């Protein structure tokens, strides 16, 4: 992602402090998302046996992360202020989809409705045409009229 943002000169701030904040959020996502997908998602939705301790432990961590995001977005349009960048793309792909798409059928369990700022931010990003295209790739179709693209080989796959 960083390579592409640098190569095309978009979505990555060039000013040092703005770039550092963007990279901090990008690396925050890399360090935190495994708790959401690999931890919470696995034990809550996919594990053959349901154990209360890991479900509660990972749920607590996911809620803490949602709280971090919600507080940051309280006075900001995007993660780093007024400008959309790669950190928004990376974080929204996990946490935005959790609050908007009821990932793992856990919206009620995690009380995602209480994270109003995360929802507002995710809704705005989810309306962006490029984000809409990106969420179609490598996702299992949910029905006969679904526009999911299992594998992408060419830009025309998104037409």
Stretches found by the model and what they are:
Residues 5, 94-95, 135:
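Active-site-flanking alpha-helical
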Residues 36-41, 79-107, 113-120, 125:
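GST superfamily/GST-like fold recognition
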Residues 1-56, 60-63, 70, 159:
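GST-like domain detector, emphasizing the conserved glutathione-binding G-site
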Residues 135-159:
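Acidic/histidine-enriched, glycine/proline-rich intrinsically disordered or flexible terminal extensions
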Residues 69, 88, 125-131:
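Residue-level signal for nonpolar/aromatic packing positions in well-ordered secondary structure
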Residues 58-66, 94, 121:
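Alpha-helical packing segments of well-folded alpha/beta enzyme cores
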Residues 5-6, 31, 74, 100, ...:
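Residues at helix-coil transition
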Residues 10, 71-83, 129-134:
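Surface-exposed helix-capping loop/turn segments at secondary-structure junctions
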